[in-house]
Amino acid sequence: MLFNVLLRYFWRNYSTIENAAELQLRQDHVVTLESRPPNIEGKGEITIRDLVINALRMRPDRIIVGECRGGEALDMLQAMNTGHEGSMTTLHANSTREGLSRLETMVLMAGMELPHRAIREQIAAAIDLIIHLERLRDGSRRVVAITEVQGMEGDVVTTADIFKFEQVGFENGKVIGRLRPTGIRPKFIDRIEQAGIHLPASVFGVGERLRNY
């Protein structure tokens, strides 16, 4: 699971919220929260949204929501926009672009009468990166796109693909290909470098793109 790989690089003091605990956590000071369905009398339900709201009261550095399916998306965005950088969640969509549209729909499910532009502004401010996984025709799951959310242009959230999966063949029932840089240097790279992580421009194919011209 991609989440488990990414969480290995987290330090501590974060909260995870899931319908059923699946994440493998080894760090210190991690709070794991699980939702609970109602009993036979229809009482006692604890929703993902309830848990997001309560997790914020614990003052974690980051909040990890296993999957956003409804109104909790609004609380997640607000958490990301109020100092909880590095927070993550997942959702189901056919592309990174459709993922943004679905996220907007889920925010509306919170029951708040927010203008579409206001929701998109929150999305653009909160999210830096979208990783799109897809099941390929050989049944394997691969990262097929890593996309940066760059901001707003008018009423539209703007994005740019930083890496895209390129299929070069299909042999013995297996898809052959790899993730290739698009030649676009992400805007958030300065923040990464401020954290002490220095990536050469060649990682993003910037020099390669110039040579191709």
What are these regions (language model features)?
Residues 128-132, 145-148:
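C-terminal helical "lid" of AAA+/P-loop NTPase domains
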Residues 139-213:
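NTP-binding/hydrolysis catalytic cores, primarily Walker-type P-loop NTPases
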Residues 1-2:
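Hydrophobic positions on the alpha1 helix immediately C-terminal to the Walker A/P-loop
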